Amino acid sequence: MPKIDEMQLKKEIKSGDFKNAYLLYGEESYLKEYYANELKNKIVDKTFEAFNYHSFDGKDTELDDILKDAQMLPMMSEYNFVLVKDYPIEKSSNDIKLLEEYLSDAPDSTVLLFWFDALDPDVKSAKFKKVIKAFEKAGNCVELQKRSENDVAKLLVNGAKKRGALLDINVAKYLISVSGNDMKNLLNELDKLAYYANGGEITKDIVDNMATKCLQARIYDLSKYVVAGKSSMAYDVLNTLFEMKEEPIIILSAVSGVYVDMYRVKCAKNAGLGFDLALIHI
């Protein structure tokens, strides 16, 4: 079976037409965890969860133990569900061979799910490609990448509505610029902002006053204050960054980048380019 996308995975979960194996990987941690939980909640009957649900942390287990549980028959349910988080499957050729053998003849009554959170496999490596190929024989592989700014902003607008608050799409995009594009973090911020709005609108002022700024936003503020000559405010931001244990070289690099951009604009303007064309050269 070929790789499928997020929409196809949604359809499978909704229809209940499950495959015997799933591999979830990619950049977006929130989506991987979300769909792992969605599969579990749809497949596992809570009445018999103690018998039919087996969860493993890859740091603390062996593949043999995982596959033994995957061979078990379900009790009073259609499926035995085995969830494996962060198992370094591509590190061992022997593990890959064992997994290939299992997936080549996977039992129809088991759904085996591998997903990666803290562990970041090298998806371009020959070993991981073998893992993908093995999973495709018995099920589906889904690469969940970070969504576009527009998609995340729409999710935040809908999320605010579910929380009893209003959020304009442009304010949602501003929140992304302030707090970063990590969906799990953004939804945590949304919980806080919606509570503060108390059934009203989440405004730009509320975001400025309540949202936690990501590293990029804080460094942008630092650069802005340095360029404007506001040394006191710049030192306040710098102290906050040091309290966050940020590396000085990263901070220096980001601030230096602002001066490089200004120099590029100056050179472009000196070359007779208009303001809009000068910006293109940044």
Regions found by a protein language model. Name each.
Residues 1-280:
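Conserved beta/loop motifs at nucleotide-recognition and modification sites
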